Amino acid sequence: MDIFDGLSALGGLCLFLFGMSIMAEALQRRAGGRLGGQLRRMTRSRWAGFFTGLAVTAAVQSSSAAMVMVVGFVNSGLLTLGQAVGVIMGTNVGTTVTPWLLSLGGLEGGGFPGRLLRPAGFVPLLSLWGIIAYLSRNGRRRDTGQALLGFATLMQGMELMSGSVAGLAQAEGFRRLFTAFTDPLLGLLAGALLTAVIQSSSASVGILQALAASGQVTVGAAVPIIMGQNIGTCITAMLSSVGASRNARRAALVHLLFNLTGAGVWLAVFWVVKVLAAPTMLARPVTLPGVAVIHTAFNLLCTMLLFPAAGLLERAVLRLLPGEDGEKGTELDSRLLAAPSAALEKCRELAGEMAALARDNLRRGVAALTEVQPASAKELRRQEERIDRMEDVLGTFLVRLSGQTLTRRDNARAAELLALIGDFERLGDHAMNLLESGEELRDKDISLPAEDRRELRVLTDAVEEIADLALDAFRREDPAAQAEVEALEQVIDGLKEQLRSRRIRRMQQGSGTMELGFVWSDVLTDLERAADHCSNIAGCVAGLPDGNQGLHAAQTALRQQDPAFEDRVRRYAEKYRV
């Protein structure tokens, strides 16, 4: 082997790693979001979690990416630790798909089918197909094209590496190196170190398959190296869990314990068999498909051994990392960006909490208009601060999420949530304004006349009903509620004008001061604007256009086109008559 063979091997390695990287990236975009949502929904039992983890890892071709996703889900509360254990075991089996694809380079046989299945036959076809798909304007087709180009690139890199190391078969140093790796402990450490450095067990196994093409890697050397690769792949999840919640760190630790225990047990069995039986099979050169067989068999044996003991693994990490999380884990973890559907589900869950806080604050603000309770006022302010923080966190995350490659449906959901959280925050602001108006009435010792109190109660009851209608529509994702909300919102607009005119008339008759008139005007404005935001919420749920002008134009059109709209208005006008 000369310097040019060395450069070819290095170039092949670079192509291999680059191809695997862009293929995994495209597959994560193509399937990660949808499968991420399934990962959230299909983990109710340990077996379901196992098969879901297997499917997700096989689809994105990266156990490291799947584990980062799991850590993010546990950190965000989308998965419990118990659910994560089954998923983690599934990711180990799912990662065995890649070596089987790479073993196509070791196929032999003549004829058209045999030649087509070898890299020299299918790589040009995949490259052509990939380029055509990549030039498409459709995002999903572009991702498919990138995945095909990535696979073609990694197979070309694999061929280049295999051809370059073929000359190593006669190199004495290379033979001595792999003779040393027949020591199980050295092989285990070598596999773990290589995988930890490149942070991909699939890539590490691929490199081993390329070296196996030299004919100098024996079965006895390959087995402990593959065991070590399973340990080295844990580094990605461990690094990902740094700074995460205690439960997320436990999930990463389960992954490490699972692979350490499996490797330890089967390495001991391998060593005993090697010493006592010394089978000649261990001295035979391993083929590319042989590496895939060993990798698959080892991961299946580990799962068979430890799946029944999954509860013990969970209890072990609870003892190693005792205690409870001081606070709820990071509400929106950046790891969720790899699974847009699950990320949107979490965003919607938090938006629901935000809506509930805004509704509770509106109730407290209305109550403060007649009597300010210090404890209630303190809680309203605390919840208002939380609503503001949630809007900042959700808004920032949704903007980042919108920058990812999303399906049309997910993109629409992200835009809807961005609009909704703004309305929830403004609803909370108006509740805060009502509290301040109540405090102003108290501090200035202004009392509302009985007639004003009666009329105000009618308006606040209408506003509380429209808030319930709008927020229930959001929770149930019910677009039909928009018609009821629009009718009630029109009645509230009329009530506001009636109450404003009546207060002016009473002031002209000497009932109430100018200060009362100013506060009264502020209260009516806040209640009317709160109703407007409820109308916006129902409009968003109904899928009306974004933006104030588009939304209001669509609402006006609906009022004109709905033959039952006037009947609804009359019904609410009768209910809330002053």
Which residues fall in each region the model found?
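Helix-loop-helix hairpins and the membrane-proximal interhelical loops
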Residues: 1-46, 146-193, 211-214
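Hydrophobic core segments of alpha-helical transmembrane domains in multi-pass membrane transport
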Residues: 9-22, 53-57, 124-136, 150-161, ...
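Hydrophobic alpha-helical transmembrane segments of multi-pass integral membrane proteins
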Residues: 43-69, 184-207
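Membrane-interface alpha-helices at helix entry/exit sites of multi-pass transporters
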Residues: 78-90, 216-225, 247-257
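Cytosolic, long alpha-helical scaffolding segments
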Residues: 79, 105, 217, 243-249, ...
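Structural signature of hydrophobic alpha-helical transmembrane segments
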Residues: 89, 113-125, 180-181, 221-232
